[in-house]
Amino acid sequence: MLQFLNRCSKGRGAWLLMALTALVLELVALYFQHVMLLQPCVMCIYERAALFGILGASLLGAIAPKSPLRYLAIFIWIYSAWKGVQLAWTHTMLQLHPSPFTTCDFFVSFPSWLPLDKWFPAVFVASGDCAVKQWEFLSLEMPQWLVGIFAAYLFIAILVLISQFVKPKRRDLFSR
């Protein structure tokens, strides 16, 4: 399996497939926000930014999958997925155990050199409350789904990183 992941990480197809999954999740989030009129909270926006990190990592990996740039893409992928798990877990705890003493921020605070909420307000401006449960599917809230999604991204990313140190098996069909 690790040899298979090693081969996949050196081709564009797997990276583009990951980009497609992240893009679909981003489009679903925008559908929830602009069509279903669910108001994203600050944690939702941070989770969205982590998903954009995974999307960016996959596009970086697709640019030059056979070069050392692939390692940078894998590390960005792992970092974004890890932050996504942390954010989604914190968001889940805010929803499952609401407290007047533990709340999320009122406004998103991106770095001054990357004010995404100013550049793309339709995507990165928060208007909801983190403790409010707005959507449920199969008895799980949205942040609970995101814990699983980000954990899957993280698990696969760690396997891909480990596979980089496995030598691919040579397929020499005519040497026997």
Curated annotation (Swiss-Prot):
It is a multi-pass membrane protein. It holds the Pfam family DsbB. One of its GO terms (cellular component) is plasma membrane. Keywords: Cell inner membrane, Cell membrane, Chaperone, Disulfide bond, Electron transport, Membrane, Oxidoreductase, Redox-active center, Transmembrane, Transmembrane helix, Transport. The keyword Protein biosynthesis does not apply. InterPro entries: DiS_bond_form_DsbB/BdbC (IPR003752), Disulphide_bond_form_DsbB (IPR022920), DsbB (IPR050183), DsbB-like_sf (IPR023380). Residues 1-14, 66-71, 164-176 are cytoplasmic. Its main location: membrane. One of its GO terms (molecular function) is protein-disulfide reductase activity. It is found in: Cell inner membrane. The chain crosses the membrane at residues 15-31, 50-65, 72-89, 145-163. Disulfide bonds join C41-C44, C104-C130. The keyword Disulfide bond applies. Residues 32-49, 90-144 are periplasmic. GO terms for biological process: protein folding. Belongs to the DsbB family. PANTHER family: DISULFIDE BOND FORMATION PROTEIN B. Required for disulfide bond formation in some periplasmic proteins. Acts by oxidizing the DsbA protein. HAMAP family: DsbB (MF_00286). This is Disulfide bond formation protein B. It comes from Yersinia enterocolitica serotype O:8 / biotype 1B (strain NCTC 13174 / 8081). The lineage of its organism: Bacteria, Pseudomonadati, Pseudomonadota, Gammaproteobacteria, Enterobacterales.
